């Protein structure tokens, strides 16, 4: 009895060549619909599923392979006498290889203006059923869902007369991953259509983009996975030059891109260890970068710079003056790109347009914290001047700028800004006075005339007192402390204006 392979694929890559090789190795090919027609046109020896089942495709192809002669052939345990007896009694022949990839549900829902009905029609039923049946019976059946595995299967059949059990076991696991991804796409699409923000079950499936050399540290193994639907941000950056991105590169670049999105005007963001070390806006990208660099010329060394305008020659010439890990921008002038390429190891990334909202996830031991991203805008109507003195227009511009930056600094966070640039950043301290002192010390003489943004309220007036002493002229903070009155009193005493936003921006 000839061995049998059932082939039904939506992605036709390499399938004709694979089927022909199976023919040469003595396999009878069974197929359906478009795959059958393609194989037949290319002179592959193939029979229709309906010829095996004795039952036609019905309901516009919704029912094709859901038949005992297919699933019995897939699920029969070959060394079980009762199973073999059942096969013979019902005229069922074993199926040894199954090659399937599923209806293009992902591609369908990514189309513009796709209807729910169109999406539903692209939910595969027979395909996942056959994949699961074949994978369950991996000891006897080889299941293929990825064209990358075709050559391995052919080589093993040539060498051993069949695939090795360890290969079948691996392919079975891969097959269940394939259906898990498929089901998660359907589930999340339908949850979205039901407008459910936090469903009873969280089902995420990501596709591996690359293996990393190592993780956050050299002793940690790591890989990078992409969202198969929401393609944007660091996951979709195009690398134009330089070494492969590391785990930390990707993490830091992501932080830089998230902060960069806060600004519509030309902006430059420098990041180290996911924290901004220099941020600036200006009338052009060259000036924005110069201001960001001058914010902290020490910490930017070995950092990541993200820009939201095309990099010109002048800017490129400045960028190569120091060691940077990565430069990110929406585009690069040709000559500017050639200048940057002189730095052999500099990673150059082109940031593509596009952004989609998704959950902010935090892994904890034994669980997952899920929340909306912190993307609330500053509502000018809700700003409350709580001091006798109000900020000037120039101070107000810097306060808005500093507020955007402080949201992206690890708590407890303080940002000092002046003339559209950070001059001091206090990062990740366990009380509020220490990051204030850190930021003022870093700013030095630039602290005088700057403004201060705090990610959370002041529990004591000491922050305001330090700000007054450092020459800071205006403060923006959430407010809401039991001691707000003391902080307001200190601000009035020091001649400093202060605004409450009513919004906290903790970042952990």
Swiss-Prot record:
One GO cellular component assignment for this chain's record is: cytosol
| GO terms of biological process kind | 'de novo' IMP biosynthetic process
User: Could you tell me which SMART domains the record lists for this protein?
Assistant: AICARFT_IMPCHas, MGS
Biological pathway: Purine metabolism; IMP biosynthesis via de novo pathway; 5-formamido-1-(5-phospho-D-ribosyl)imidazole-4-carboxamide from 5-amino-1-(5-phospho-D-ribosyl)imidazole-4-carboxamide (10-formyl THF route): step 1/1; Purine metabolism; IMP biosynthesis via de novo pathway; IMP from 5-formamido-1-(5-phospho-D-ribosyl)imidazole-4-carboxamide: step 1/1
**Catalysed reaction equations from the record:** (6R)-10-formyltetrahydrofolate + 5-amino-1-(5-phospho-beta-D-ribosyl)imidazole-4-carboxamide = 5-formamido-1-(5-phospho-D-ribosyl)imidazole-4-carboxamide + (6S)-5,6,7,8-tetrahydrofolate; IMP + H2O = 5-formamido-1-(5-phospho-D-ribosyl)imidazole-4-carboxamide
Q: Which superkingdom heads the taxonomic lineage of this protein's source?
A: Bacteria
Q: Which InterPro entries match?
A: AICAR_Tfase_dup_dom_sf (IPR024051), Cytidine_deaminase-like (IPR016193), MGS-like_dom (IPR011607), MGS-like_dom_sf (IPR036914), PurH-like (IPR002695)
Q: Which SUPFAM superfamilies match?
A: Cytidine deaminase-like, Methylglyoxal synthase-like
- What molecular function terms (GO) are annotated for this protein? IMP cyclohydrolase activity; phosphoribosylaminoimidazolecarboxamide formyltransferase activity
- PROSITE patterns tied to this protein: MGS (PS51855)
Q: What is its EC number?
A: 2.1.2.3, 3.5.4.10
UniProtKB keywords = Hydrolase, Multifunctional enzyme, Purine biosynthesis, Transferase
User: Which positions fall inside the MGS-like domain?
Assistant: 1-145
Q: What is known of its domains?
A: The IMP cyclohydrolase activity resides in the N-terminal region.
**Similarity comment text for this entry:** Belongs to the PurH family.
Q: Which NCBIfam families match?
A: PRK00881.1, purH
Per its record, how is this protein called by name? Bifunctional purine biosynthesis protein PurH
């Amino acid at each position: 009895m000839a061995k049998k392979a059932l082939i039904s694929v939506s992605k036709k890559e390499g399938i004709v060549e694979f089927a022909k090789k199976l023919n040469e190795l003595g396999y009878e090919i069974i197929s359906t619909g478009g795959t059958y027609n393609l194989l037949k046109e290319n002179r592959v020896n193939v029979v229709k599923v309906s010829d095996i089942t004795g039952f036609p495709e019905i309901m516009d192809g919704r029912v094709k392979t859901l038949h005992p002669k297919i699933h019995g052939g897939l699920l029969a345990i070959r060394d079980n006498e009762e199973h073999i007896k059942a096969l013979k009694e019902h005229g069922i022949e074993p199926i040894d290889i199954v090659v399937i990839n599923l209806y293009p549900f992902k591609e369908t829902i990514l189309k513009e203006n796709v209807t729910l009905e169109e999406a539903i029609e692209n939910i595969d039923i027979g395909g996942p059923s056959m994949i699961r049946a074949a994978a369950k019976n991996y000891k006897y059946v080889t299941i293929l869902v990825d064209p990358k595995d075709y050559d391995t299967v052919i080589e093993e059949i040539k060498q051993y007369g069949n695939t090795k059990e360890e290969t079948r076991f691996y392919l079975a696991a891969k097959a269940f991953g394939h259906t898990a991804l498929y089901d998660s796409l359907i589930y999340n699409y339908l949850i979205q259509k039901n407008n459910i923000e936090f469903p009873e079950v969280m089902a995420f499936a990501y596709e591996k983009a690359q293996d990393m050399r190592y993780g956050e540290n050299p002793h940690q193994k790591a890989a990078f996975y992409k969202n198969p639907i929401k393609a944007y941000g660091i996951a979709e950056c195009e690398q134009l030059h330089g070494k492969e991105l590391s785990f930390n590169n990707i993490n830091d670049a992501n932080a830089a891109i998230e902060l960069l999105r806060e600004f519509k005007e030309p902006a430059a963001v420098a990041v180290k260890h996911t924290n901004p070390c220099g941020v600036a806006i200006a009338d052009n990208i060259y000036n924005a970068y110069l201001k960001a660099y001058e914010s902290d010329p020490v910490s930017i060394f070995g950092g990541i710079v993200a820009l939201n305008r095309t990099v010109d020659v002048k800017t490129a010439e400045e960028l190569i003056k120091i060691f940077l890990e990565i430069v990110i921008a929406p585009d690069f002038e040709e000559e500017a790109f050639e200048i940057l390429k002189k730095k052999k190891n500099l990673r150059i990334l082109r940031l593509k347009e596009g952004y989609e909202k998704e959950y902010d996830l935090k892994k904890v031991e034994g669980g997952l914290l899920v929340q909306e991203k912190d993307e609330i805008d500053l509502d000018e109507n809700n700003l409350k001047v709580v001091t006798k003195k109000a900020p000037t227009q120039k101070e107000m511009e810097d306060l808005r700028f500093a507020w955007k930056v402080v949201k992206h600094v690890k708590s407890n966070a303080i940002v000092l800004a002046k003339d559209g640039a950070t001059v001091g950043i206090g990062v990740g301290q366990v009380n509020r006075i220490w990051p204030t002192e850190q930021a003022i010390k870093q700013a030095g003489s630039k602290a005088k005339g700057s403004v201060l943004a705090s990610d959370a309220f002041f529990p004591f007036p000491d922050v305001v007192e330090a700000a007054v002493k450092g020459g800071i002229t205006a403060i923006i903070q959430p407010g809401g402390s039991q001691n707000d009155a003391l902080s307001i009193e200190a601000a009035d005493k020091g001649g400093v204006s202060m605004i409450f936003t009513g919004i906290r921006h903790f970042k952990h």
